[in-house]
Every structure is written in structure tokens, then in C-alpha cells.
């Protein structure tokens, strides 16, 4: 190991002769793996790809992973429907959970390679969302999110929340 160069000590300064410990290499992937990998059939997989592209097509890979994490966190929550299609198309008394299912964007998108890779990483167990179950656009002004949920992070054009 190469030791960093040390400056010459001044006459009255005492410099210990201890070796400098080597720093461990930082982790390359700062993501948390969830307990199990997800196995989706082709229809569920396509719905997940399309909603991620519709919601986060202009985001970077992490932004796309965050949206996919929210969907999969909901699937596994026991609070929301237990399928991707059920989560994505769920309607509540407040309306649709995901705007692209209402305005038709989910059916018009072309899924990018980056979106496919981001979704595959999430399906492989990566969770960069800190368990988020909700997100909203930074452009929307919904006080319900901030009053009712715990904000966990902001990335790109979205803010993410947990219960």
C-alpha cells in the first residue's frame, strides 16, 4: 500500500511514528437489497416497465428505480393490492393513484433501455427508496402528502414519502 506523503514536522512538534491505517474501499452500490427477488409474469412486467417510463421517462436511472421501488414496495406492503397491475390501476376515493393510467400515457410510451435496466435492478432486489410508498411531482402542490406522510427524499422531479 502506498502511504500518503507527510509534511516535515517543525522542530518543537512531535510526530508519532505509527503507520497510517489503510482505508477500506467504499461500497460501490449504496442500495439496500430487499428480502426476496421479484418474479413477475410478462404482463405484470410490461405494466411495470410502462408505468415507470410514463412517470419517470425523463429521469436518470435512480429516478426510474425510485418509481419502480414505490410500485414494488406497495405490492409487498399488505396495504395496497398485491400485484403490479392492481397497484398501478388502483382507484381510491381520491381517484387514480397514477395519472398516466387516466391520461393514457401508460399506453403511448416507448420503453427505453435505461428504464428496462432500472426496472430489472429493482426486480433483482435493489431498493434506493428508503421504503417509499408514495411520490409526487415537485411541480404539484398537494399539501395532503406533506401533512399526512413522512417525506423521505427528493430526487429529480419527484418527492418520495412513507406512511
Model-derived features: positions:
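Intrinsically disordered, low-complexity, repeat-rich polar/charged segments
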Residues: 1-22
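Bacterial extracytoplasmic/cell-wall-associated proteins, especially those involved in peptidoglycan
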Residues: 16, 21-163
Amino acid at each position: 500500500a502506498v502511504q500518503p506523503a507527510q509534511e516535515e514536522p517543525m522542530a518543537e512538534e512531535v510526530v508519532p511514528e505509527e503507520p497510517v491505517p489503510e482505508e477500506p474501499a467504499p461500497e460501490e452500490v449504496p442500495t439496500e437489497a430487499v428480502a426476496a427477488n421479484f418474479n413477475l409474469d410478462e404482463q405484470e412486467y410490461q405494466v411495470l416497465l410502462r408505468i415507470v417510463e410514463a412517470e419517470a421517462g425523463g429521469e436518470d436511472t435512480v429516478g426510474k428505480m425510485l418509481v419502480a421501488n414505490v410500485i414494488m414496495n406497495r405490492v409487498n406492503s399488505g396495504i395496497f393490492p398485491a400485484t403490479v397491475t392492481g397497484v398501478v390501476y388502483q382507484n381510491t376515493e381520491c381517484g387514480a393513484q397514477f395519472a398516466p393510467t387516466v391520461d393514457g400515457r401508460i399506453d403511448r410510451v416507448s420503453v427505453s433501455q435505461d428504464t428496462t435496466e432500472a426496472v430489472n435492478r429493482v426486480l433483482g432486489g435493489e431498493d434506493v427508496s428508503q421504503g417509499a410508498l408514495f411520490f409526487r411531482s415537485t411541480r404539484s402542490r398537494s399539501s395532503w402528502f406533506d401533512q399526512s406522510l413522512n417525506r423521505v427524499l427528493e430526487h429529480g422531479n419527484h418527492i418520495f414519502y412513507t406512511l
